[in-house]
Amino acid sequence: MRRHPPLDPTMAPGPEDNVRNLRKRQARGPGTARGCGPEVGGRRKNRQKRRMVAQASPGKDKVERDRSVAASGAEKATRRRVERPRGQVSPSDRRGIQAAKEAELRLQTERHTKEKRKVTEASSDDPQPEIDLVRKESLTSSESFQTVECLQSLSKEGIVEGIKRRRIRNKKLKSLENPPLKVTENEATQNIKVEFQDELYKNTPKYSCNILSPEVENNSILKLHVCNCFPHSKGCNDENNLPYKPDGGCMHVAENSSKLKKENLRSLAEKSDTNSIPRLLQTKESVMGVNKLLLEESDLCQSKTNDLLSCLQREKNKYSIEESSVGRKSRKRIKSEKAVTESETVTEMNFYEYNKSELMLQENKMIADGKEAETKSPLNVLRKVSHNTVSLMDHLLSLPEMVGKETSPEHHVNAVCQKTIEPLLKEETENASEPLGYESMAQTEDFKSMKSSIGKSPNEYHIEKRSSQEELRRESEELKLSCQRTIPMTGKRTWPYYSCARISAWCWKKASLPESSYFLPGSQESCRQDDVLKHQTNQTHLTDSKLLLQSSLTETNIESSSKEKLDSNSNCLSSVSAIEHTLMVMKEPIIEDDKKIKSEELSKSGSEVVSNTTEDTQLISETQILTGNKKKDRGNLTKLNLIATSKDGQEANNSTGRTIHRKSCVAKQTFVAPDLVKILNTGRLTNFKIPLLKNKTEKRKEINAKSSEREAYSPLELLDNLSGAEVRQNRSKESVSMTTSGPQTLSIQNSVTPAQASSDSFYDKNSCSIYPRFTKQDNNNKPSNHISERGNIVSNKEVASLTVENNTFSYDPGYVEKNSFFSCNEQETFQPVSSEVSVRKITKNFSEIKVGSPDILKAYEDDVLLIDVIQDDPDLFGVSNEGELSCTSGVSRISQEPNVAGEDQSADFKYMETPVKKEPSDNLRELSVLDTGSIKSEACASNSAASEIRHDSKDVNTSLGKVANKASENETLEDFSEQIKGSNLDKKHRFTDKVIIKEEKEKIYEVCKSKDSRNADIMVDECQFAAPVPKPLCLLVPPLNLSGHQEETVLNTWTNDFRFLGKHSVLKLQNPATCEIFKREKNVGVLQKSLGLMLPYKYCRFHFNTLRGCERPLCKFVHVPEQGDEKVCMDVFKKYININELCLLQRAVNIFMEYYRKFPPGIHFDLQVLNDLLNSLLKHCLLKEVFQIVNLSIMVKIQPSLKILLNIFEHVATMKLRNAVPALTDIFCKLIEAGMVLDPEHFNYIVKLLYQVQASKQEITAVLEMRSRLQTRLFKKNWKCDLDSALNKLEHCKEKGDWTRLGKLYLNVKMGCEKLADFETFCACIAKTLTKHYEKEGPDVPFCEFAETVSKDPQNSKVDESVLGRIGISALFFYHKLLQWSKGRKVLDKLYELKIHFTSLKGLIGPEMLASRCQIVNVAAEIFLKSGSLNGAIWVMRESEWIINTPLWPCDRLDVLNRHNLLCTIAHDILAKSLFRQAFEVLQNLPGFQNSQETVEVSQYSILFNKLLDSCIESNSLGTSSSVAEFMISKSVPIDFSFLRRLITSLGRSCLWLKARAHYKSALSLGCYPQLEGNLYRKLLLIPSYLSEIEMLLAMEIFMVSNASSIQSPGTSTQILQIVLKRCENNQSQRNDDYQAAVERLIMAARISDPKLFIKHMTVNINKEQVYSLEHCSVLKWLKENMKWAGKVWLFSNH
């Protein structure tokens, strides 16, 4: 971006400010920058500048208003913000601006004296757009105007002026502290601080906190919005009470950043005193001097940084502990009050946490000037806020709307950020004290004020710092000047942090600002909605930068920084994040230099993008540093963090949120990274004159191009592939985990793995939950905007990703970018969140970043002389991809893989959005995880510590979510292997299986073996690659778990080669979404070696043909062989077994289970392969998988070898796996039942092993039972094989008549014979032996003895019964044929005794084999009859259910005839015995009565039935008689009427009237009785005289019922019912006695009725027949009583 025009005269500091500034100048000496004396001078100059700024503050307010009105472009807007409003102010402001420019020029000249200053100056140019944005925001108030003026002047003049501006800001703050300014201090002061700080920081971050400050600025904006919400910004929020106050509109800037800004500008302008404008002008004028002073002070601060840092860290730890004990809300409130009343104090606290060096310098300044400390503290606050604001401004600049509207909201944001970020900036300044000399001094002052605000004995703390201030400054300067980095692990010289190898790719000119502005649409929107989130993010960045600085600092500095971090974490972890940028730059000469230069370059390339990127990077770096330093300082920082977390869960949550925001920012950075990568790939790296770099770059480019062409996942992927070329270079053992490709990230190699492990794992959850935190803390859920802003930052920052050697966390802007995108998605603020939009934006950023390449080239030129090129330095030159595969290269590959995972996550960002809904409690837990991760990361700084931390990070990863890691790992592996193939690296990198495995192990040994390693698969590089996609924070960065050796190598690699060679950072992503990216970036990242399998086209190469397998969430290729591809299965199994890797063996188990569950074994199945697989599984102690395979094998009728079974038992016994015994016993029994044969010694051995493992008695008994079964089976097999010998024995038994022995022989054969045909053959032989072949006469029946022996067998079964029944049938036919009824009877009796139902069986031999059931029953019944057993015959009939001929049991007509004859015979025999019921049963089952198929005439059975009926009547068996009569009538069997009449009479006399009436009615229908006669006038009943009285009565009943209607009618009383007793027509000569008897029976019939009937004799007719009449009254009475039942019986038929 072009530098902003010089500040207008309106910016000139006011008179009051001038006075203050003069005082300060007097207080300070001219030489404060170089020593104590110079420091004092610098302070004086700063005070003078501040006075000038204070004078210009009134003008700034107007300028702010004007700026908020007019802002069309990023640069124009910023310029307008600064120029227009200020231009509208008085000319004094212009003079102040000119003065500031001059001071800035002077400061720039001084800076150019040192390379670091140059870098800083270069970076200061970039963040101007952000500065403008911040200025707009700060213009809202007079103080903000002052800040804006200073910032503008700094942006124009350079870093020096930026420093001066900070001083001016501090002075302005002091001036603002004046009563009129105090009135608006909540808003105006804060805004001014933020504005001023933003401008200063925007310019400053370029050289001092380049990366950090932009991020800090953005963070400050977010902090302003989220100060209330961010738990980790407690301290900052406390200091940022101004945003909390009604005046502080920062809290809601995210929602309506433009509106709020405007409103804030208005309100602030109104609130700010008119004097603020002149103060600002004065400040502007003094800006130049202030800048110089600041630079000098920065030098002094750097020199004293180390000492002060140690003190600050200790104090900070104490403070963090105390603050953690204090309630989050209370601390925030207290800090807010302090921020309002004691901006100095707040500033000090912030700087105290922000930058140790700055704090120390500030402390010295405080010693020099207490009042100055107050003024400086505001200035520091402004600086911090400016850092935060710069980031925020960058974000706002990135947001087009924010560019024009930022003025007031940005001011509020800055104000809020100032307080919120102050602690963070302090720590950041401390960490970045080298680059921020002026900031260091100002921050020192701020630190002083912070002390007071901290409430800890900060005075003591500052005193300690004061004592070591000068030393720290010297050390900081030495660090600045230091061009080499010392790596104890490798002993190699280190490269300056601003080295060309590390900065060129990171540095971006202002042109990169448009890149960030590409994000601006979404970022701006995000900013509006999520300014609070920005604030949180800024705090998070501060925390990150704090962490980075701490890690980079020496152990002493680290301790102090950790203390400060604790304090800052307690107060505002987010501020620490903002500070992280500075810290990263300042901590170690190497890391600091790299970071510093990178941040500066980034600032140059685009202050907005760089600032955002820096902010994001700072978040991650800072968080990483926190985690890393915390890890190092387990005693201090870890404890403090834990204390802070436990004491204040909200604070812990805040810190966690900050960390997450940090990552989010990193994701944003990653978003921009593709552009940066493109630029680097396009030409910057080519300009580097490092051996092998170009070649590697070209090679990587080719690979990336291939992978991108082959896997056209997204433009992001293509960009990442472009960067992947360099990534491969880095991967070839140039440990530069930070890759210009796609997401260039800040990675701390040494600590990267563990730090990542911890922070990533922590961030995994937190990234998702951070937005929930932000959502809860900031109702607007602004993190998305904040993240998008960071994304913008990342575009520049990404290129400038910083790598902190000692910092545990590898900063992956891409990853953070993804997270930020995710938040944007959730917030829906960042509308173009889609991957395509993101890609487009990235492309734009890339092109814009490309514009900023000259800065990188310049940085390269500047640093090329400082680089000691070691020909054998693998960090710089790397190792060829094909040749050497060192741990470093493996690590690099791993770090590259994460980019692919990042892509996946970006693709799945929707899925990741859900984590945003996490509860604050989750965030708190995540915070604790973060602490652990940070400790781990710090430990990673050293190789030994790295391994330990790796384990810790593993735990963290596990706690975060192993499943996601696993999924991501699998997907990553699969996609990676595909990329290898796509990039045609199969041939180059194709090794033997073992070599491939080893290489894979070096790269991802932990990945394959542990879930943590799976997390490691998901790397931030992948996230970076996917960063363009709106993958939200959900793209968690799981910790990278590497072996100690790998970690060590990684650390060394980072240290030796920090340059941006296109390598991806080592941060890994835990979410499955990252797997997708991870897969896509496999070409750029770790290349999976092909296993050399020849697979069909449809099969997934990654799943089958790579060690790590397929990791796609939804892979379109086949993962399980299809039917008919069993040969492929066998080949895969053989290959996996040959490689003998755990992950491959487990995959083989899965393939085996999936395939053979669906398809049975085929011709290609190889039992040896199965056995080998089981052996391999046992060697790896995969007993569960062994059981699975064996169980499935048994189901598909495949038995492993006996040796395998014994090996399993041995393994269980050796390992004392008591719990596995039940399952193993069950498998053993199944195998025995399936046919496995064991020798007795095998059984004994197994039982012995079971005793060793202390198996239960039941389990051992089961094994013994299986031995018995096996023995029986063996016996059966023996008999089966010796059937001939059994037949011989049968003959022997026959000859000797030993039928009992024959029965035993039968049992043995039955047990040993397995084929039914053989068994039936043997049984047939027995039947023949028992029948035909036995012709001896005698009472003995062989069958009976044989059946007796067989039936006594305890294992007698239905089979035995069937065999005996069939043999018995053969014997029956045999004896029936021979008419040997007695022997046949014995056979039948034996069958009856044994309850063998032979009637349903057939014989074994001869015609009986085809005999029908009717025939068999007939034979048996006949035998019974012939033997005199009638009951036996009936039993046989009943046993056969009287079946004759049925469809189921058909028979011949002969059989039917035989049955008829047999039944008739039985019936006669039964009747003879008067067994009427049995006789009737037999007669009922005669042929013809059962079914229609029997065409037999039933009339022929009349004689039998009438005989039976007569016999029954005579015997008075009325029941049977009645049944027989009914059956005969129903079956139409002719019945004798005499028998029927006798039956009716008998029934009537027996009072069985119902049956009597029924039979009478049936007889009447048959014509047994005459029909009724009569007419209408006369009713006549003819009763034969031969009827009995019963029959007569029944006839009268019918007569009365038939005429009931006429009888009962009223008019028929005269009608007469006549009865004529007829004489027998056939017997005319009937005697009178008989007739007279008939008359008496008639009278008796009338009397029998109930009620009685009365008859009267009327006359004798011509035939001498008596005529009687029924009395009418008696008939009426009878009908009345009996008509109901009588009508039913007589009037209705029974059928």
Swiss-Prot record:
Function description: Important for normal spermatogenesis and male fertility. Specifically required for progression to the post-meiotic stages of spermatocyte development. Seems to be necessary for normal expression levels of a number of testis-expressed gene transcripts, although its role in this process is unclear.
Regions of compositional bias (Polar residues) in chain numbering: 735-753
Segments of skewed composition (Basic and acidic residues): 59-68, 92-113, 459-474
Domain of life, per lineage: Eukaryota
InterPro entries the record matches: TOPAZ1, TOPAZ1_dom
Alphabetically ordered keywords of this record: Cytoplasm, Differentiation, Spermatogenesis
Biased composition range(s): Basic residues: 43-52
Subcellular localization: Cytoplasm, Cytosol
Signal peptide: none
One GO cellular component, as annotated: cytosol
Lineage, uppermost ranks: Eukaryota, Metazoa, Chordata, Craniata, Vertebrata
BP-aspect Gene Ontology terms: cell differentiation; spermatocyte division
Protein name: Protein TOPAZ1
Residue span of region Disordered: 1-128, 441-474, 725-753
Organism: Callithrix jacchus (White-tufted-ear marmoset)
